[in-house]
């Protein structure tokens, strides 16, 4: 895994001073590394009968679509308000300074679907906790929340269901 971790570029003071940003675009842009990352993540879920993979806006779409393809599952998009064309349900959640809202189509799942939620990076866990809450009343089974990378020192996994978090790369 160290080889994949080393491809991710560090950008100091982005998006604000004091933050060391993990820029995953370097890994995504390297074909062999991207393929390896998708293969390693998808291997964990082979045989688990995943019906739908939820991709969280925006980089979660990349990870989610690749996993859905590899697993023979459908892809469901969770987006910012006003971006989905049909009837939606929404979840507003707290940020460090203010709030944000996510939406999902009300007809995104079939009853009993086994769902994998995918995103690029687990940091504070606020966004993923909102996604878990958003789908929790939609009569589906949450298999796991998976991430390409996790910033462990931020302890975002503590906001998510115990035993339902997997991160391929940990920083």
Curated annotation (Swiss-Prot):
<dbReference type="GO" id="GO:0044209">
    <property type="term" value="P:AMP salvage"/>
</dbReference>
<keyword id="KW-0328">Glycosyltransferase</keyword>
<comment type="subunit">
    <text>Homodimer.</text>
</comment>
<dbReference type="GO" id="GO:0016208">
    <property type="term" value="F:AMP binding"/>
</dbReference>
<protein>
    <recommendedName>
        <fullName>Adenine phosphoribosyltransferase</fullName>
        <ecNumber>2.4.2.7</ecNumber>
    </recommendedName>
</protein>
<dbReference type="GO" id="GO:0005737">
    <property type="term" value="C:cytoplasm"/>
</dbReference>
<comment type="pathway">
    <text>Purine metabolism; AMP biosynthesis via salvage pathway; AMP from adenine: step 1/1.</text>
</comment>
<dbReference type="GO" id="GO:0006166">
    <property type="term" value="P:purine ribonucleoside salvage"/>
</dbReference>
<comment type="function">
    <text>Catalyzes a salvage reaction resulting in the formation of AMP, that is energically less costly than de novo synthesis.</text>
</comment>
<keyword id="KW-0660">Purine salvage</keyword>
<dbReference type="GO" id="GO:0006168">
    <property type="term" value="P:adenine salvage"/>
</dbReference>
<dbReference type="InterPro" id="IPR050054">
    <property type="entry name" value="UPRTase/APRTase"/>
</dbReference>
<dbReference type="GO" id="GO:0003999">
    <property type="term" value="F:adenine phosphoribosyltransferase activity"/>
</dbReference>
<dbReference type="InterPro" id="IPR029057">
    <property type="entry name" value="PRTase-like"/>
</dbReference>
<dbReference type="InterPro" id="IPR005764">
    <property type="entry name" value="Ade_phspho_trans"/>
</dbReference>
<dbReference type="Pfam" id="PF00156">
    <property type="entry name" value="Pribosyltran"/>
</dbReference>
<dbReference type="InterPro" id="IPR000836">
    <property type="entry name" value="PRibTrfase_dom"/>
</dbReference>
<keyword id="KW-0963">Cytoplasm</keyword>
<keyword id="KW-0808">Transferase</keyword>
<dbReference type="GO" id="GO:0002055">
    <property type="term" value="F:adenine binding"/>
</dbReference>
<comment type="similarity">
    <text>Belongs to the purine/pyrimidine phosphoribosyltransferase family.</text>
</comment>
